């Protein structure tokens, strides 16, 4: 992101935001609720437009492309904090619905569905309506749906919110393994610092519409500005 700024009326949301994500890197975005983390994702996928700035992927400004074209052209997968699936469909039918949009060849489509079912260990819940799945199962489903198009960039919005400790650990391990297996660039936003810093390579801290700190987890927790803006003086990862 280069010099991204956004305001709603007289309220400044983002002010000259600059950061980059390297290929195959996991980047975390930290900050309290309402600081603009999810807004950055909405800018990337095209739900809103910035007042100023550029979002560059593979040397091209994604802002030059409409929302319908953007995610497929730049291979962006998006996992929203809430929803992201068809409530009344079974888990299997959710996967089929997305595959029919993204994969033309029927054989390739079925192969990809089978792979995702196996990879996410979904065999036992294929015929359960999505609305009856647990929080962790829903999250696994939506991530699987986001991976259907083989994304190079994966956006995870508040993916640890309202989940129990064991489910969070499972998702952390899944995120790290996806990076290793697929070399995907992954961006995670969350306001729970400890959960996020346990599985990212680098992170940024947002405060007062700006990026106030960036670095590895160990660098950030010792950063004076990050402590003042977010962590506090006694924060530790473990």
Regions found by a protein language model. Name each.
Residues 96, 107-125, 173-176:
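Conserved ABC ATPase "signature" region
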Residues 82, 89-100:
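Q-loop/switch helix immediately C-terminal to the Walker
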Residues 129-133:
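Conserved ABC ATPase signature
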Residues 30-32:
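The feature captures the beta-strand-to-loop junction immediately N-terminal to the Walker
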Residues 53-62, 71-73:
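Conserved ABC transporter NBD signature motif
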Residues 45:
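Helix-to-loop junction immediately C-terminal to a conserved catalytic motif
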């Amino acid at each position: 992101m280069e010099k991204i700024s956004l305001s709603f009326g007289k309220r400044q949301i983002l002010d000259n935001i600059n950061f980059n994500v390297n290929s195959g890197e996991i980047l975390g975005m930290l900050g309290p609720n309402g600081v603009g983390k999810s807004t950055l994702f909405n800018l990337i996928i095209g739900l809103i437009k910035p007042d100023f700035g550029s979002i560059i992927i593979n040397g091209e400004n994604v802002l030059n492309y409409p929302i319908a074209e953007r995610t497929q052209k730049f291979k962006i997968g998006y996992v929203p904090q809430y929803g992201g699936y068809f409530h009344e469909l079974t888990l299997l039918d959710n996967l089929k619905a997305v595959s029919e949009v993204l994969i033309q060849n029927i054989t390739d489509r079925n192969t990809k569905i089978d792979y995702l079912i196996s990879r996410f260990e979904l065999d036992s819940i294929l015929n359960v309506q999505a609305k009856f799945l647990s929080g962790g199962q829903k999250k696994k489903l939506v991530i699987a749906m986001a991976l259907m198009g083989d994304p190079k960039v994966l956006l995870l919005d508040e993916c640890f919110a309202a989940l129990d400790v064991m489910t969070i650990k499972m998702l952390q391990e899944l995120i790290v393994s996806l990076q290793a297996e697929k070399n995907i660039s992954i961006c995670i936003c969350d306001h729970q610092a400890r959960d996020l810093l346990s599985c990212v390579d680098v992170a940024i801290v947002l405060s007062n519409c700006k990026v106030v700190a960036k670095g590895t987890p160990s660098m950030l927790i010792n950063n004076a500005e990050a402590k003042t803006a977010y962590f506090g003086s006694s924060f530790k990862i473990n």
